[in-house]
Swiss-Prot record:
Alphabetical list of PANTHER family matching this protein: 30S RIBOSOMAL PROTEIN S2 PROKARYOTIC AND ORGANELLAR (PTHR12534), SMALL RIBOSOMAL SUBUNIT PROTEIN US2M (PTHR12534:SF0)
Record-linked InterPro entries: Ribosomal_uS2, Ribosomal_uS2_bac/mit/plastid, Ribosomal_uS2_CS, Ribosomal_uS2_flav_dom_sf
GO term, biological process aspect, one: translation
Superkingdom per UniProt: Bacteria
HAMAP family per record: Ribosomal_uS2_B (MF_00291_B)
Keywords: Ribonucleoprotein, Ribosomal protein
Protein name, entry field: Small ribosomal subunit protein uS2
Chain coiled-coil ranges: none
GO molecular function: structural constituent of ribosome
Family: Belongs to the universal ribosomal protein uS2 family.
Organism: Nitrosomonas eutropha (strain DSM 101675 / C91 / Nm57)
Lineage, uppermost ranks: Bacteria, Pseudomonadati, Pseudomonadota, Betaproteobacteria, Nitrosomonadales
Disulfide cross-links: none
Length: 251
């Protein structure tokens, strides 16, 4: 998917926050103001958004992992839906402190979640008494809500895609500590520092959030398909070379 200016306008990407809440570090990306609302310069956003998508494509082509993060109400369902569509891990409920910096401990909780899911599948849950089964179900739901999106993640992600960097401050701090690159949607009231790939734009509109997440998921799928295509082309070339050698031998 190639993002266009028209798509961004229709999604309201250009609508920033009230001027009194602005962060001066976002000044280079602001076009002006209308009715005390800052207007994002979409010419800058278009270039930076496309750069971020190119980066995601390259990572995906190299089989690297991008973690989707969006825990605010407007982003939760969209982040989950698009991450699942492209096979990426995601966090769409509460960000647990240490989710990156203390990943070893988080892995233990993920193991517990996976063991509990096996118990459901093999019928062990049915053997529990009513109260135990109820407690089990509650724990399973809680673990699934916080860790379900990363249960297949074998290690730390290679990069992160974050909706609303202000809302996810803890996430950004952890990523920066570990040197994990961040692609982040940054509205006019937030600080772009610590974000390697800034996407200046509206982080509140569900339409805008869907545009960002869908484009990122598409870029990941395109990158993976590109890698598969390259393998196929190499296979074809090898076959042609071998075929040519066989013909030479026959001659």
């Amino acid at each position: 998917m190639s993002v266009t200016m028209r798509q961004m306008l229709e999604a309201g990407v250009h609508f920033g926050h009230q001027t009194r809440f602005w962060n001066p570090k976002m000044a280079p990306y602001i076009f002006g103001q209308r009715n005390k609302i800052h207007i994002v310069n979409l010419e800058h956003t278009l270039v930076m958004f496309r750069d971020a998508l190119d980066y995601a494509r390259r990572l995906a082509a190299n089989k690297e992992t991008i973690l989707f993060v969006g825990t605010k109400r407007q982003a939760r369902d969209i982040v989950k839906e698009e991450a699942i569509r492209c096979g990426a891990p995601y966090v769409n409920q509460r960000w647990l402190g240490g989710m990156l910096t203390n990943f070893k401990t988080i892995r233990q909780s993920i193991k517990r979640l996976q063991d509990m899911e096996k118990m459901v599948q093999d019928g062990t849950l049915n053997k529990l008494v009513k109260k135990e089964a109820l407690d089990f179900q509650r724990e399973l739901e809680k673990l699934n809500a916080s860790l379900g999106g990363i249960k297949e993640m074998k290690g730390l992600p290679d990069a992160m895609f974050v909706i609303d960097v202000g809302y996810q401050k803890g996430t950004i701090i952890e990523a920066n500590k570990l040197g994990i690159p961040v692609v982040g949607v940054v509205d006019t009231n937030h600080n772009p520092a610590g974000i390697q790939y800034v996407i200046p734009g509206n982080d509140d509109s569900s339409q805008a959030i869907r545009l960002y997440a869908r484009a990122m998921a598409d870029a990941i799928l395109e990158g993976r398909n590109q890698a598969i295509q390259e393998i196929v082309e190499i296979g074809k070339t090898d076959s042609e070379v071998l075929s040519g050698q066989d013909l030479s031998a026959d001659a």
